[in-house]
């Protein structure tokens, strides 16, 4: 008997690869992960609000179980900005601009927040799973192909995400922490069925 399908709704190949790598660490993961890129409206609000609305819309569009993800990078000196709007900030001002936002502030600490959402299907409850990693904003270091990874030095490592090999990143990142909670939920759910 084959495993039920779970669709990860994303158009970001880097996120998809990380999720596949992290899920592969779970022996006998009870779902077959597929991927679909949907054009979904993104509301404005907290990361949790965005993740919940996006997942409900995706489940309705797909007519089945799905997961979505929303990521934020919050600068403590700016009260959590850019937060869930980091993607737009990156497109507009890039790594250097994000660094310049903190010029004049002693506090360069930041929180990376990942919220995964799971929905079993249309009109079903959306479940949220949040992971958080602390760090400090630094001038870009390492490859620049994956969002803001080069500017967040992770607390206690001396490395930015971009400087880490995928195995190291995928055992301590905000995405890993959120996915671990999601995996535990999904494994428990599969045992109930």
UniProtKB/Swiss-Prot annotation:
Alphabetic keyword roster: Cytoplasm, Hydrolase, Magnesium, Manganese, Metal-binding, Nucleotide metabolism, Nucleotide-binding, Nucleus
Keyword Cytoplasm tagged: yes
Membrane-spanning residues: none
Binding site for ITP: 10-15, 54, 70-71, 87, 146-149, 169, 174-175
Principal place of residence: cytoplasm
Cofactor: Mg(2+); Mn(2+)
Cofactor comment: Binds 1 divalent metal cation per subunit; can use either Mg(2+) or Mn(2+).
Any GO MF annotation of the entry: XTP diphosphatase activity
Record-linked CDD domains: HAM1
Cellular component GO terms, alphabetical: cytoplasm; nucleus
Top EC class of this enzyme: hydrolase
An individual GO BP term: nucleotide metabolic process
Reaction(s) catalysed by this chain's protein: ITP + H2O = IMP + diphosphate + H(+); dITP + H2O = dIMP + diphosphate + H(+); XTP + H2O = XMP + diphosphate + H(+)
EC number: 3.6.1.66
Chain sites annotated for binding Mg(2+): 42
Keyword check for Repeat: no
Subcellular location: Cytoplasm; Nucleus
Family: Belongs to the HAM1 NTPase family.
Subunit text: Homodimer.
Biological role: Pyrophosphatase that hydrolyzes non-canonical purine nucleotides such as inosine triphosphate (ITP), deoxyinosine triphosphate (dITP) or xanthosine 5'-triphosphate (XTP) to their respective monophosphate derivatives. The enzyme does not distinguish between the deoxy- and ribose forms. Probably excludes non-canonical purines from RNA and DNA precursor pools, thus preventing their incorporation into RNA and DNA and avoiding chromosomal lesions.
Listed name of the protein: Inosine triphosphate pyrophosphatase
């Amino acid at each position: 008997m084959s495993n039920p399908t779970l669709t990860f709704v994303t158009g970001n190949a880097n996120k998809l690869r990380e999720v596949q790598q992290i899920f592969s660490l779970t022996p006998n993961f009870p779902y077959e992960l597929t991927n679909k890129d949907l054009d979904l409206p993104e509301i404005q609000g907290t990361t949790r609000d965005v993740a919940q609305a996006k997942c409900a819309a995706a489940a309705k569009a797909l007519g089945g179980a799905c997961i979505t993800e929303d990521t934020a990078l919050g600068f403590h000196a700016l009260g959590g900005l850019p937060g869930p709007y980091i993607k737009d900030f990156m497109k507009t001002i890039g790594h250097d601009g994000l660094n310049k936002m903190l010029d004049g502030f002693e506090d360069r600490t930041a929180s990376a927040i990942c919220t995964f959402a799971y929905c079993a299907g249309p009109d079903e409850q959306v479940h949220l799973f949040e992971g958080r990693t602390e760090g400090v904003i630094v001038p870009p270091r390492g490859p620049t192909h994956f969002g803001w990874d080069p500017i967040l030095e992770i607390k206690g490592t001396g490395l930015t995400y971009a400087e880490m090999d995928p195995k190291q990143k995928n055992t301590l990142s905000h995405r890993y922490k959120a996915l671990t909670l999601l995996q535990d939920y999904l494994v428990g759910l599969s045992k109930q069925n």
